[in-house]
């Protein structure tokens, strides 16, 4: 699951939150960045050799390592159809940093010394290798959970490359208004990776005129939710916003049922799990998540409306069935799609520099129809992350399964607002529009 920030994806992962506790300040903003190397290492007459850098093992591997599986599935699909300009895509160098910042920096150098053309599939809580990869102009694609990706034209996150926690407020305000919430509680852990988005959401709710009756931005991981829930019950909370991981969210749901708040909705930034919902149907009823991509459930809800997601589900089921409904694996698929789109635009004789230039001239990348358009002429900077419109899809747990909610006429799953929280039309190219 992704960290809470629009550019990074829709959900905060326990791995990121735990990482924040272990190493709170691990950002390496680049002092120098390249526009891409002039050469074409790893490119031969019949293949393009790339690498990946993920936390495949170690205490923080869950929620990061599976990005590589999404990349593999997309490459397998492309290779089955002849590759790109007759070259097969070869994910030959798969480095594992085991969630260790020092190892990550070393493995980034290993990838360069191994002469890979690009790094496709970065999934790690500590991307300390970002600065070096940016300096040498290595095209790099991955799951963005830190500001290490900011302002580097060769680094490409799945949904943009500038981390901005403040953008979470737009989804929260939209959901609160759709639910006609009158008393909102907001709860997070006491670490920036969790608290920043929830604090921004509370501020946005208040700015939008939605009453926030209870706040706790210092809840402890694995703590007792009852004291908070007792106060929430006294204030008649009808919507809970949480920036926590799945088991703590479930503990809050259980306590809310015990103290008379079982009919309240909850907006969880993290915790999307088909198994958890199926195992706890009554506790999870009314839980809402937001997606920056077409929800997996939209294929069933709106047959034929979202062919790109249908293709994703089909190909992932074929090549990586364990990870079909995993959001980090999905981001790996998007990373691979971005890489391939750039290769095709760069032409039959690509260099690292021409690949980067091709992607950074793209103004409406949707991964073939999976997400609202990303404008790469702006998506590396804070200006691009705050411009809007802000579009998301929403799913709700109902009787042990997820269903799309807040949909528009004709099965449009994306709802968009401007910086004043006013509904606006989806940008051209948005799936389902």
Language-model-detected regions and their locations in the chain:
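Beta-alpha junction/loop-to-helix N-cap segments that form part of ligand/metal-binding clefts
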Residues: 33-38, 62-69, 80-150, 218-226, ...
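Bacterial signal peptide processing site
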Residues: 27-29
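Extracytoplasmic ligand/sensor domains, especially the bilobed periplasmic-binding protein
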Residues: 116-217, 264-289
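Bacterial N-terminal signal peptides that target proteins for export
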Residues: 1-14
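C-terminal motif of bacterial Sec signal peptides marking the signal peptidase cleavage site
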Residues: 22-25
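Extracytoplasmic "Venus flytrap"
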Residues: 36-72, 94-101, 188-196, 324-331
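Extracellular/periplasmic periplasmic-binding protein-like sensory domains
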Residues: 158-161, 255-333, 409, 413, ...
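Segments of small-molecule ligand-sensing domains
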Residues: 318-329, 340-404
């Amino acid at each position: 699951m992704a960290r809470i920030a629009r550019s990074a994806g829709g959900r905060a992962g326990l791995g990121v939150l735990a990482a924040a506790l272990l190493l709170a300040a691990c950002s390496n903003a680049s002092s120098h960045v390249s526009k891409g190397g002039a050469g074409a290492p790893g490119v031969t007459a019949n293949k393009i050799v790339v690498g990946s850098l993920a936390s495949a093992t170690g205490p923080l591997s869950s929620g990061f390592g599976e990005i590589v599986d999404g990349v593999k599935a997309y490459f397998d699909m492309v290779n089955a159809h002849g590759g790109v300009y007759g070259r097969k895509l070869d994910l030959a160098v798969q480095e594992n940093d085991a969630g260790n910042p020092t190892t990550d920096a070393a493995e980034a150098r290993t990838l360069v010394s191994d002469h890979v053309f690009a790094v496709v599939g970065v999934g790690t809580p500590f991307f300390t290798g970002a600065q070096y990869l940016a300096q040498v102009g290595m095209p790099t694609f991955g799951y963005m959970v830190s500001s290490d990706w900011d302002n580097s034209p060769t680094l490409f996150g799945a949904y943009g490359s500038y981390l901005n926690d403040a953008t979470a407020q737009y989804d929260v305000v939209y959901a609160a208004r759709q639910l006609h919430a009158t008393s909102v509680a907001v709860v997070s852990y006491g670490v920036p990776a969790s608290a920043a988005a929830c604090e921004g959401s509370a501020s946005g709710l208040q700015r939008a005129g939605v009453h926030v009756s209870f706040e706790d931005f210092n809840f402890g991981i694995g703590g007792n939710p009852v004291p908070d829930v007792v106060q929430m019950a006294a204030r008649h909370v009808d919507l809970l916003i949480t920036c926590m991981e799945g088991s703590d969210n479930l503990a809050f749901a259980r306590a809310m049922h015990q103290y008379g708040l079982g009919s309240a909705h909850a907006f969880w930034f993290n915790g999307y799990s088909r198994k958890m919902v199926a195992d706890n149907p009554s506790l999870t009823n009314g839980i809402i998540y937001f997606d920056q991509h077409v929800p997996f459930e939209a294929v069933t809800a709106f047959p034929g409306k979202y062919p790109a997601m249908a293709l994703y589900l089909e190909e992932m089921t074929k090549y990586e069935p364990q990870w079909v409904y995993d959001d980090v694996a999905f981001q790996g698929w998007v990373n691979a799609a971005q890489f391939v789109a750039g290769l095709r635009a760069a032409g039959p004789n690509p260099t690292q520099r021409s690949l980067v230039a091709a992607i950074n001239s793209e103004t409406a990348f949707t991964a073939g129809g999976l997400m609202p358009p990303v404008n790469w002429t702006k998506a590396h900077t804070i200006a691009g992350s705050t411009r809007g419109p802000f579009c998301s899809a929403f799913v709700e747990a109902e009787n042990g399964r997820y269903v799309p909610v807040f949909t528009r006429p004709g099965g449009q799953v994306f709802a968009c607002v401007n910086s004043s929280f006013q509904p606006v039309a989806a940008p051209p190219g948005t799936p389902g529009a």
